[in-house]
From Swiss-Prot:
One of its GO terms (biological process) is lipid A biosynthetic process. It is an enzyme of class 2 (transferase). Catalyzes the N-acylation of UDP-3-O-acylglucosamine using 3-hydroxyacyl-ACP as the acyl donor. Is involved in the biosynthesis of lipid A, a phosphorylated glycolipid that anchors the lipopolysaccharide to the outer membrane of the cell. One of its GO terms (cellular component) is membrane. Belongs to the transferase hexapeptide repeat family. LpxD subfamily. This is UDP-3-O-acylglucosamine N-acyltransferase. Keywords: Acyltransferase, Lipid A biosynthesis, Lipid biosynthesis, Lipid metabolism, Repeat, Transferase. Its EC number is 2.3.1.191.
Length: 356
């Protein structure tokens, strides 16, 4: 297999960096500081990595000007303002891209479906009636597209993905293995001790430049659509219920669950294992730390927490006991005790001042 090589000059130009060293030096991959060899380029993304960079065998380093001044003058450098961003940009250069195009013989495609000539449809893919697959989009083996599904250009659908009836996906969207989009929402009407199923008549709309991880579920709406706006990134094992709306450029980490008809604003961050109840609104620019449970709307931007951090087990037990005891003490009584303690402290402070 021919491994592509890129000159240091070419890579510096791609990340709009300033080159120091041998401009013709060829590199064939990215690697960590610890594992890099002479044909690799690595990056320094913080003061704590400077010592590792001094010991690294990398052929070149991406650094800030401040870090460059702390490292050997003999090394090759690309100097940028944000090394981590430059690293992210170069991962696309060194990515092993899939160049295969066409439709595999085992794929089953409805005659009414429209597939771009330069798309790729993998083995045993099933594509239903009136579907549209855009230019340069890749759909890997065993994926399923129900009727009236649309995928824009430059998309990537990994193996065993199910895109159910009516799902609409725009350009440059990546969907990873075993994810299901457009499944039936969890809607039931309780009556006389039984649950009566509500048919989910909406669908799912996904904007441009969205990334959805593996084993996610995004349910279609009951009446209106479930909407994922442009630039949203979703980790693995995330559940998004019917009629949810996720604002543009929001990031959702693994194991989050968002209940039905909730609206999450733009540029939000949901750290791992957050839970969000249904029918609430979270404004723009909100960060929820790990394992937070959101039970009411959030109207002001900021960082919010409700998860309990790790502590030694015996300490945790004592804390839980005290926490339960708080519920049995009226708030007015707690306030009186605090006022009494404050009075005692002030009295002691006055006594010490007089003695001085």
């Amino acid at each position: 297999m021919n491994i592509p090589h890129y000159s240091l000059e070419t890579l510096a130009h791609l990340v709009q960096g300033e080159l120091f060293g041998d401009e013709h030096f060829n590199l064939s991959g990215l690697a960590s500081l610890e594992q890099a060899q002479s044909h690799h380029i690595s990056f320094v993304n913080g003061e704590k990595y400077v010592e590792a960079a001094k010991q690294s065998k990398a052929g070149a380093l991406i650094v800030t000007s401040a870090f460059k001044d702390q490292l050997p003058a003999s090394q090759n450098y690309i100097v940028v303002k944000n090394p981590y961003l430059a690293f992210a940009q170069l991962t696309h250069v060194f990515e092993k891209k899939m160049t295969q195009r066409g439709i595999e013989s085992t794929a089953k495609i409805h005659p009414s479906a429209m597939i771009a000539d330069n798309a790729y449809i993998g083995h045993y893919v099933i594509i239903g009636a009136e579907c549209v697959v855009g230019e340069n989009t890749v759909i890997l083996a065993h994926s399923f597209l129900g009727d009236n599904v649309e995928i824009g250009r430059d998309g990537f659908v990994e193996s065993n993905v199910s895109l159910l009836q009516g799902t609409k996906i725009k350009d440059r969207v990546r969907i990873h293995a075993n994810t299901v989009i457009g499944s039936e929402g969890f809607g039931f009407a309780p009556y006389q001790g039984k649950w009566h199923r509500i048919v989910q008549l909406g669908t799912v709309q996904i904007g441009h430049d969205v990334r959805i991880g593996s084993n996610c579920s995004i349910d279609r709406g009951a009446l209106d659509d479930t909407i994922i706006e442009d630039g949203v990134i979703i980790d693995n094992l995330v559940q998004i219920a019917h009629n949810v709306r996720i604002g543009s450029n929001t990031a959702i980490a693994a194991k989050c669950g968002i209940a039905g008809s909730t609206v999450i604003g733009k540029n939000c961050i949901l750290a791992g294992a957050c839970g969000v109840v249904g029918h609430i609104t979270i404004t723009d620019n909100v960060t929820l730390t790990g394992m937070s449970m959101v039970t009411k709307s959030i109207s002001e931007a900021g960082t919010y927490s409700s998860g309990t951090a790790l502590m030694e087990n015996n300490q945790w037990k004592r804390t839980i006991v005290r926490f339960r005891q708080l519920a049995d003490v009226p708030l007015t009584q707690i306030m009186k005790r605090l006022d009494h303690i404050q009075t005692q402290i002030e009295s002691l402070e006055s006594t010490f001042k007089l003695r001085k």
